[in-house]
């Protein structure tokens, strides 16, 4: 048992995407026992036998043995076709893990079909002996399993009655098997690197070597069985009874004609990761994308928050190995501001270039290209200046295809002399003899010096070479004829802030080739492009501006049963993560050494095993969903948040030893958190309103208007406020009081407001006035002398404070362009705003600069400011409430100083 430390957890319980990083079917109930029927066992034997056949192929290198094995492969395929009562998804997983599969099963079957007519006499006897061995094995199985005889007999009757009755289905199933082999080779290309780079050129085996091959076949089959058992045990948590019930033969019978064979494996893998709750949406997305050769240009993904839109789309695109780029428009817009357009351009090009580089490296290893390098990441600059630059770089990335490289390579190889080619063949032969017999069967080049005795083998090897070249073309088509995908998440933020960028991205197919008179891009064909827009609600038609409303994939809300299934599967992550965040020093969580999915909770003398914890968790999830689903079904993130934070409160009485972990105490545990649930679900749609009212942003008594400035900056702001509110004629009183060394004399009590006083007079008094720079400094000096007994010395510190206030926009230069004021309109007999409405800090660009620039000295990096002479007109841009709070903090009677 190993203790889990608090810092070992990487899961954020507040984020739905992070908590679901593990496989969606990662947990199988400890109380569930996997029940397998004889039919289920028979299917497992068939899949394992087919895998053993592939293992045997890698152990032998003769053409005769390959013909023999093809017959076994055909028998296993026929048995798979006939046994369509149930299809075990575990068999697909074993096929994924089998790294010794051939690259192109169609080509091998074609070759073997041609060789069947010539070599019937060679392998008929062997097949008969194999059948006898199979019969002996079946007899032994019948003796050992007497209870299942009737089921097996019934299943064999079904096989005999339904044999080849549905030829269309058998053809489709064969094509699907071949397609699965191709998909698995592409998915497992990283594992097949060494095998694809090596080409075996072996001699035909003599009769004395037959015993060696048979023993090697048996050893390989045993090793493959052991490896498959280990892998099935290791990855057994990916599959449970629910998957086996959902994925049946009838399910695949309807599924195979509707889904392109090239992406069938990616579809199944995405279902394993994301769950069957989004099967309908994934099927709709596949119908729109097709085989990714010519997808729809723009696709819209819509759904409420927490419904798995981004997770499903990104996982499916990754599993198809298509070059793609992902941009979160929310982060790009609100983190970059004005430069959001350049950030989005750079993110798209950077992600796309990295994926294209990975695609090219995979293509090189598949086709054995070593003398050529291509790095698309070097085409992407660090800063994308404008839209034209973005489209030109994107055109270069999408117009690259390695066809010319291969053609040049083949022509140079054909020009070589025969002696050089023979020497190269000998070198290859020596290398392959030293490395062993571990490469693919399609790459077996059995070239011999004994041409008279082995003419048939030599011809077959030549045909294999041709097939390998066609396989190269297949991978070229597979990789470079597919389209590129751009995923734009939270697109509504891009529409609000940069509608021109949204317009360009949705019409990227038109702009990528530039103007019609650009001859450099005329004859270059580019790859297809698909834009996937992810949003919460549909965009209005006028946003698309002539572009038809794109087809939509709706991610509707999860049902209550779906929510329960998802939370059941989050047991390993959410259950213990929420307990680790709970502040309890006595609580300790352990996991089992041989199985890290089984946990044990210990607190003082209370010990809870994994089965008990899981049973309590399932009952807790049922209670939470039944109570709060109606309130939080539109936001799954909130439901996850409630579930994770209520769990420690729910299980606390059991951990404290107050209640026993039995079924009779479940009602007491529910009553313990019933009050918390009612509070959490009360006004769930507006539960932040009271927090905002009581927050620092809306409460006058808190720190809302407090500005973190120095002492002299605050004094300068108060002096600027007095200069903007009082007329210059009233400054004499302040100067006289300062010269005499006394305090300010309080003004006489103001007269009451005159009823006949016009609104224009009141507005003129309330509007802040501009003031000169020398007047601002003099009033500030008066405040320092009278209230703090200091003098304002214009040193470097004061200059720096003045520079900071101007650059922050608190004090700005007075001009008709950046000053908003009310003026009288003689035509309308009223008042109106003059200039820009609002703060000059937000509406002018001349006030933005770095704090390192100084307005008192000219530097190369400084922005263009007006000269700050003593009579420069300035204006204050700070709210009056903020000034009053500063005056209260500094104990300055502001109302008494305003005349």
From Swiss-Prot:
Q: What is its EC number?
A: 3.6.4.-
**Broad enzyme group:** hydrolase
The record's listing under PANTHER family reads:
ORIGIN RECOGNITION COMPLEX SUBUNIT 5
GO-annotated biological processes = DNA replication initiation
Q: How does it assemble?
A: Component of the origin recognition complex (ORC). Interacts with PCNA1; the interaction occurs during the trophozoite stage but not at the late schizont stage.
- InterPro entries from the UniProt entry: ORC5, ORC5_C, ORC5_lid, P-loop_NTPase
Task: Describe the task this protein carries out.
Answer: Component of the origin recognition complex (ORC) that binds origins of replication.
Which SUPFAM superfamilies does the record associate with it?
P-loop containing nucleoside triphosphate hydrolases
Enzymatic reactions: ATP + H2O = ADP + phosphate + H(+)
Q: Which family is this sequence assigned to?
A: Belongs to the ORC5 family.
Q: List the disulfide bonds.
A: none
Q: What is this protein called?
A: Origin recognition complex subunit 5
């Amino acid at each position: 048992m190993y203790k889990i430390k608090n810092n070992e957890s990487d899961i954020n319980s507040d984020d739905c995407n992070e908590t679901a990083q593990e496989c969606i079917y990662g947990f199988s109930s400890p109380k569930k026992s996997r029940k397998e029927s004889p039919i289920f066992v028979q299917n497992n034997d068939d899949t394992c036998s087919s895998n053993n056949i592939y293992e045997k192929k890698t152990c032998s290198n003769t053409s005769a043995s390959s013909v023999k094995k093809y017959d076994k492969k055909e028998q296993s395929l026929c048995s798979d076709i006939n046994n369509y009562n149930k299809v075990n998804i575990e068999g697909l997983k074993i096929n994924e893990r089998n790294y010794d599969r051939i690259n192109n099963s169609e080509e091998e079957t074609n070759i073997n079909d041609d060789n069947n007519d010539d070599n019937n006499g060679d392998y008929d006897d062997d097949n008969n002996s194999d059948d006898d061995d199979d019969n002996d094995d079946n007899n032994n199985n019948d003796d050992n399993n007497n209870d299942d005889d009737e089921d097996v007999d019934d299943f064999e009757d079904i096989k005999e009655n339904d044999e080849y009755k549905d030829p269309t289905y058998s053809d489709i199933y064969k094509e699907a098997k071949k397609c699965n082999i191709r998909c698995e080779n592409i998915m497992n290309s990283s594992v097949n690197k060494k095998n694809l780079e090596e080409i075996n050129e072996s001699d035909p085996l003599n009769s004395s070597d037959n015993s060696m091959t048979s023993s090697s076949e048996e050893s390989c089959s045993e090793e493959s069985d052991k490896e498959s058992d280990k892998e099935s045990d290791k990855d057994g948590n990916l599959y449970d009874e629910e998957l086996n019930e959902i994925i049946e033969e009838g399910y695949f019978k309807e599924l195979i004609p509707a889904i392109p064979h090239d992406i069938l494996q990616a579809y199944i893998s995405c279902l394993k990761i994301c769950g069957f709750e989004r099967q309908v949406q994934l099927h709709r997305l596949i119908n729109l994308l097709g085989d990714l050769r010519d997808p729809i240009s723009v696709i819209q993904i819509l759904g409420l928050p927490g419904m798995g839109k981004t997770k499903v789309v990104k996982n499916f695109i990754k599993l198809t190995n298509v070059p793609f780029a992902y941009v979160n428009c929310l982060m790009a817009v609100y983190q970059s501001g004005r430069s959001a357009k350049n950030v989005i351009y750079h993110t798209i090009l950077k992600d796309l270039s990295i994926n294209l580089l990975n695609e090219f490296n995979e293509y090189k290893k598949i086709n054995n290209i070593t003398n050529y390098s291509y790095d698309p990441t070097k085409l992407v600059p660090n800063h994308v200046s404008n839209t034209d630059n973005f489209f030109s770089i994107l055109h270069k990335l999408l117009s690259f295809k390695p066809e010319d490289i291969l053609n040049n390579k083949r022509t140079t190889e054909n020009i070589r002399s025969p002696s050089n080619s023979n020497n190269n063949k000998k070198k290859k032969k020596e290398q392959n003899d030293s490395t062993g017999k571990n490469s693919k069967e399609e790459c077996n080049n059995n070239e011999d010096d004994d041409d008279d005795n082995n003419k048939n083998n030599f011809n077959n090897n030549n045909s294999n070479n041709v097939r390998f070249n066609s396989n190269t073309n297949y991978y070229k088509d597979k990789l470079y004829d597919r389209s590129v995908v751009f995923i734009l998440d939270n697109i509504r933020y891009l529409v609000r802030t940069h509608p021109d960028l949204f317009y360009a991205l949705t019409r990227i197919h038109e702009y990528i080739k530039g103007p019609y008179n650009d001859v450099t891009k005329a004859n270059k064909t580019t790859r297809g492009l698909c834009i996937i827009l992810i949003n919460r609600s549909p965009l209005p038609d006028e946003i698309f501006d002539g572009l038809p409303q794109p087809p939509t994939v709706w991610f509707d809300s999860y049902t209550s049963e779906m929510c329960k299934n998802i939370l059941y599967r989050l047991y390993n992550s959410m259950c213990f993560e929420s307990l680790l965040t709970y502040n309890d020093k006595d609580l300790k969580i352990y996991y089992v050494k041989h199985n890290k999915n089984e946990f044990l909770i210990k607190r003082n003398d209370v010990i809870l095993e994994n089965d008990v914890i899981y049973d309590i968790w399932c009952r807790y999830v049922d209670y939470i969903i039944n109570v709060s689903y109606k309130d939080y079904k539109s936001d799954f993130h909130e439901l996850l948040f409630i579930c994770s934070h209520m769990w420690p409160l729910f299980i606390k009485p059991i951990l404290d030893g107050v209640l026993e972990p039995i079924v009779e105490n479940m009602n007491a545990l529910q009553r313990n958190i019933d009050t918390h649930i009612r509070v959490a679900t009360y006004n769930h749609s507006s539960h932040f309103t009271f927090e905002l009212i009581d927050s620092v942003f809306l409460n006058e008594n808190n720190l809302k208007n407090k500005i973190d400035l120095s002492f002299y900056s605050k004094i300068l702001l108060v002096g600027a406020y007095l200069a903007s509110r009082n007329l210059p004629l009233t400054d004499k009183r302040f100067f006289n009081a300062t010269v005499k060394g006394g305090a300010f004399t309080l003004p006489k009590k103001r007269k009451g407001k005159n009823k006949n006083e016009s609104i224009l007079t009141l507005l003129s008094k309330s509007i802040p006035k501009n003031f000169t720079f020398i007047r601002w400094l003099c009033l500030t000096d008066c405040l320092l002398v009278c209230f703090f007994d200091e003098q304002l010395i214009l040193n470097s510190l004061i200059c720096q404070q003045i520079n900071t206030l101007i650059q922050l926009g608190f004090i700005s230069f007075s001009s008709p362009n950046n000053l908003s004021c009310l003026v009288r309109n003689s035509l309308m007999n009223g008042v109106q705003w003059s200039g820009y409405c609002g703060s000059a800090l937000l509406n002018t660009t001349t006030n933005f600069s770095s704090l390192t620039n100084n307005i008192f000295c000219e530097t190369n990096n400084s922005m263009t400011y007006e000269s700050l002479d003593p009579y420069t007109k300035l204006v204050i841009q700070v709210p009056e409430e903020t000034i009053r709070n500063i005056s209260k903090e500094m104990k300055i009677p502001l109302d008494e100083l305003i005349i």
